[in-house]
Amino acid sequence: MNLSRRDFMKANAALAAASVAGLIIPVKNVNAADTSITWDKAVCRFCGTGCAVLVGTKDGRVVASQGDPDAEVNRGLNCIKGYFLPKIMYGKDRLTHPMLRMKNGQYDKEGEFTPVTWDFAFKTMAEKFKSALKAKGPNGVGMFTSGQSTIFEGVAKSKLFKAGLLSNNIDPNARHCMASAAVAFVRTFGIDEPMGCYDDIEHADAFVLWGSNMAEMHPILWSRISDRRLANPDTVSVNVLSTFEHRSFELADLGILLKPQSDLAILNYIANYLIENNAINREFIEKHTKFKRGETDIGYGLRPQDPREQIAKNVKTAGKMYDSSFEEFKKLVAPYTLEKAHEISGVPKEQLEKLAKLYADPNKKVVSYWTMGINQHTRGVWANHLIYNIHLLTGKISLPGCGPFSLTGQPSACGTAREVGTFIHRLPADLVVTKPEHRKIAEKIWKLPEGLISDKLGFHAVAQSRALKDGKMQVLWQMCNNNMQAGPNINEETYPGWRNPDNFIVVSDPYPTVSALSADLILPTAMWVEKEGAYGNAERRTQFWRQQVKAPGEAKSDLWQLVEFSKYFTTDEVWPAEILAKNPAYQGKTLYEVLYLNGQVNQYSNDELKGRLNDEAYHFGFYIQKGLFEEYASFGRGHGHDLADFDTYHKARGLRWPVVDGKETLWRYREGYDPYVKAGEGVSFYGQADKRAVILAVPYEPPAEVPDREYDLWLTTGRILEHWHTGSMTRRVPELHRSFPNNLVWMNPNDAKKRGLKHGDKIKVISRRGEITSYIDTRGRNKCPEGLIYTTFFDAGQLANKLILDATDPISKETDFKKCAVKVVKA
């Protein structure tokens, strides 16, 4: 049989899309085989796509799952990880009791992990918290939390720390992945999160992936893009930019390999091209945008004594923006010619020009997608801005099939970390602790005395590790993440603080992760459908699920842990005496009483459960999830962050906010789609006081570390399809573990040959901060250009993040996991 090139491409891409999406599951057979299985809806535990699943339970266990055919997001499909969701809960080493390091019947930093009661664990924790608060103040204690926590848990922990302990020292691991996107959204539009939705996929003519391997990281969305591309081969294109070739290149019409950090130059070149070729939408620009110029030479978020910080001119004003004009913007991007962009990026000129023409074509609807390649970047905020610039200059924004779209990597990085506000500076609905009027709103809604919430920021993720090491912080509670494996520069900056004898580290986790085994107290955690939950995905969709099975042994949900722990503090112990003197009704109350028995959180009866499982509600005596949600939702209703009522979400397959009069919003800021845009306005970026979005001029600046004679290779890190983050769940699924049991290092064959290496050799990867032992792959799914290697961080036996420099974006404080210098030698 003869196949044309087009037919071959279509067949190959369809096969790739099917395998990536995990379309090997005869889900209908599950129902047919066993009618005694009880099915209920839930949300996938993994990435930020927000796929809906049907969960099958029998005899108190989750025994099956399948894609929910009624869900708009995934339309009945699951990726390979989603298919094996039931097995993440039943690893043989599941934790079932609190475990405290003890010797001779007492806590000892060098002791052995010993089972203790919850009461003993909490009394020990409370003693350490109170001691640290007294010695170091509010930032003496802290929490490192997660974009995997449920919305209810996010509200509970934000209240416990910010309103109870009066400490803003709580930050999520979303700092490592979404902070740059969030900061740039707010700086540009005045409101966080994308204006578009997944429906853009079925409307777009072109997809541009900036630093995103959607084929493996967002496979269900990739299956939709593949379907769109293959059904319209003459009109729809896929364009992929990356520092190495990955599976998304298999479908790409234009695959671009660029040098690390050079995305800044390419994006500025495109802006220059649009202006020089009169391909800008002048009417849109004049009506709906304003120009600003960013501060430059802002450093790399390293320790102040680092020489790179010492020579940077504007470290203290890194986030400052200055009023500007179109003419100044034009002048500032003018140096980014085709020649200069080629010189900096190494990308062939014809490819750069083809990409620029794609954005310039007034008849092409373009969606730009990006993930960690843009966000995990020492200039990640800038890179986000530069993508927005292109869409604002062309007016290709807030329309079906047109817009910039930052994809999230965790199931509720949006819904919990960003919308609830579990960052050191945030409160719900884009409010911030640094603004007095915002604190007053929170105090009123939470029924707290005026002036209680602090304006003092806590330590961001990387700074928490430094503070523990430096003795500025003494207690850390890590919840729903594995930062000892996932964080940067763990040998030099994280581990020393955790094992400092003056510090006390608590880890809440279902499994004995690298973090848990490095802690002093491990709290066993209920996971996924062992609790009632809610997530918010990348397209602003809020989705609920009910508890469907009970957790094993003494394992308790994070929500239970947070609320129960609040009983061990009184206001007299942690609130200022002057505030209590003015508000005597709060004196002597426990934090549990003032935060969770405030007449709002506890107003809903457990009768509403109608006998359904809900361990937390029955323990506390009221429908706590509903109370927390309704209190939280009141922050955003009427302010562009409207959420539907609690009961609606249990009936629906999720709704995209703002939800006004029962109707979700698909495209924000555009008349006819967004209820907050008035008739006749056309477009209104209403998050800004003047309703104008910012077009920001910022330059290319080099990375914090580059290869040299000794460390002669770039290292970039990321994930693979089969595993998620640090593998603490997926490596306990036998099928996923067998499919990819250990980490590898992908290298160009020529680089391997120069070093006397070949495919399969055992090697050492060495940076200025540490080394790992691994195996080389020169033939696999990832194809690296000469001078760059790629590896992952899922393997606890190869702690790849020992190698990573803890440089951050000075504005967002997000870590750059994509660029550092290493050398490779035979082991």
Swiss-Prot record:
Primary localization: periplasm
Enzyme class (EC, first level): oxidoreductase
* Pfam families associated with the record: Molybdop_Fe4S4, Molybdopterin, Molydop_binding
The record lists its disulfide bonds as: none
Q: Supply one GO molecular-function term.
A: iron ion binding
Recite the UniProt cofactor note for this protein: Binds 1 [4Fe-4S] cluster. Binds 1 molybdenum-bis(molybdopterin guanine dinucleotide) (Mo-bis-MGD) cofactor per subunit.
Per UniProt, subcellular location reads as:
Periplasm
What is the protein named?
Answer: Periplasmic nitrate reductase
